Amino acid sequence: MVKLTSIAAGVAAIAAGVAAAPATTTLSPSDERVNLVELGVYVSDIRAHLAQYYLFQAAHPSETYPVEIAEAVFNYGDFTTMLTGIPAEQVTRVITGVPWYSTRLRPAISSALSKDGIYTAIPK
């Protein structure tokens, strides 16, 4: 015979597992929510590797960045509102334009999107 407390514990464990599982959403890669996650990772990476970004900028002076990104890098508060409205193609250009995109940024962006329950799909 199964004790009622065992059943209650099992139900609670299942409920906790369901509550802990993030909801998933499939979005276009150009959706602003995707862009904000990407830019959040990008700003964090710049902060962590500032000297590397300065060297890259010095070697590629024609590569420009939206002023909102520079402001977000040096503003240690909530910067997400600063980054809204940057066009998706500009987000893609600045993020994929650095040599460490494939090795450092892309995996970090994928992880951050997955953690937020966001998956991207190319629109048909």
Curated annotation (Swiss-Prot):
Coiled-coil ranges (or none): none
Biological process annotations from GO: fungal-type cell wall organization
Cystine bridges: none
Position of the signal peptide: 1-20
One Gene Ontology term of the molecular function aspect: structural constituent of cell wall
Keywords: Signal
Pfam families found in the cross-reference section: SRP1_TIP1
GO cellular component, as recorded: fungal-type cell wall; fungal-type vacuole
Keyword ATP-binding listed: no
Signal listed as a keyword: yes
Recorded family membership: Belongs to the SRP1/TIP1 family. Seripauperin subfamily.
Name of this protein: Seripauperin-15
